Design a protein with these regions (language model features):
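N-terminal helix-turn-helix DNA-binding core of bacterial DNA-binding proteins
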Residues: 5-49
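Short, hydrophobic-biased segments on the C-terminal half of alpha helices
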Residues: 51-56
């Protein structure tokens, strides 16, 4: 099991959507705008949280820095990040399937 998988055993919603955004090259401000748009406002990310996540993802090799223009930096997901995103998607689907199989009184 890789270090990224151990450190990020599961992804928070915010982590999931940051990685989802980074399938296309974008800067932090793009992410701050896209996540609420993607989730109809259900998920928002503060700028401090976002830049902390980006730094952690860079350190773990989950994203790469693609462009630096003054203070503006752009990023894109790396293969390790793609793998984590797929694993989290599969985990969430398994969780939803468990709910469908085992729900009783709460399904009404």
């Amino acid at each position: 099991m890789g270090l990224a998988r151990e450190k990020f055993k599961t992804l928070t919603e915010q982590m999931f959507y940051v990685l989802l955004c980074l399938q296309q090259e974008c800067c932090g401000n793009d992410i701050l705008l896209r996540v609420p748009e993607m989730t109809a406002g259900r998920v928002t990310i503060g700028s401090g949280t976002l830049y902390n996540l980006l730094e952690q993802f860079l350190e773990e090799g989950m994203i790469v820095e693609t462009k630096v223009e003054g203070r503006k930096r752009s990023y894109q997901i790396a293969e390790k990040g793609c793998s984590m995103l797929r694993q989290e998607y599969e985990r969430l689907n398994a969780q939803a399937e468990d709910y469908r199989r085992f729900t009783g009184r709460c399904s009404k």
